[in-house]
Amino acid sequence: MNPALRTFFCLIVAALTPMRAAYAPVPETDEGRDLVVRVRTAIAHDSNLFGAASGAIDSSVYTVAPGVNWNRSLTERTFLSASYALTLDRFDRRPGDKLLDSHDASLRLAHAFSQSTVLDLNNAFMVARNPESLLAGVKVNADQSFLRNQFDGRFTVPLAPKVTGTAKVRSALYEYRDSDLSRALDRIENLLGLAADYAVLPEVKAVAEYRHQDIHYSKLGELKNKRSDYVMAGADYELARKLTVSGRAGLEWRSRQGERSAIAPYAEFSGKYAYAQRAFVLGGVGYSLEETSDTARFNDSQALRAFITLQHPLTALIVVSGSVSLEPSTLQGRRGQADVSETTVRTGVTLSYLPTPKWLLAASVDLDRADSDDAVRNLRRTRFSVNATRSF
């Protein structure tokens, strides 16, 4: 997904804990404690370990995942949190390594200089040996393990009685384990943003925003590097923390090194309604230029992304949740290459049982489907899992 879209559109669905889960959300437990230790065990079946268009390899997967979350208010104005999770996946039919270790670590520091002047810094590090979502169109049964380190910073300060300014920064590093994927996709993405909002009403803010993005590839950057400038306007709405709606619309000016530049529309709209305890509906739509998994044939992808997520308690102890994302896109061909249209759908459903505050039992199913004009980019993947999480 385009880093600008990820940064300012999808943060509302990013989990603060690094414990990996299915596409559908899992209800939070043990809220309000400074230190939480969790151990998750799972048994799953994956129908397409490497996301291959043909010759898929399936396997049972046995998982043990310990993790720890620590949160502390250092002073009345300073908050610090840290987390780490280790995930051990054992496969019965995977070629090569059958025991994979994945790591997730995060560190967050937030400080309020005053009631309305706030600095928020967050760093997230991940080594994903068994990625949740797989790339389409890579070589058959390639190991898609990758490392990502992402730093986010945000500084908010009042500019006038009803005007607030915000400076945002993100830097994300991607490194792939497979040598071919590494040559094609290793990169660093840097994003800067400046925004000003005006309080039209206590619950409504009008927003104007500028963003600048640089994408630098480690190999053959002279053919793949990009620079983008975004200008957009929109509004944010919040009512008693139960209903939040946010929208931006504007233009992106993208300069491609070694290829033609482009001007494209940019839009992001999202909303969340928390209608009861442990119950919410979350949705959004975004349109942008995004990076592609096939950098040899395509510059980038012009994508429309829509998603909806629902969590609802069936009883005091049973919660059902589901998530659907739809992404029709057009891959922008390099000189001499035709454009390719494709649609990606990801769906997940989870049923959770919380017998005590320290136990969570869940069963989930996730479906991935990519239909492309280019047959090598088609993808079918189904995963079933049952898991238990114990908190201490």
Regions found by a protein language model. Name each.
Residues 22-392:
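Gram-negative and organellar
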Residues 1-29:
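Cleavable N-terminal export/targeting peptides
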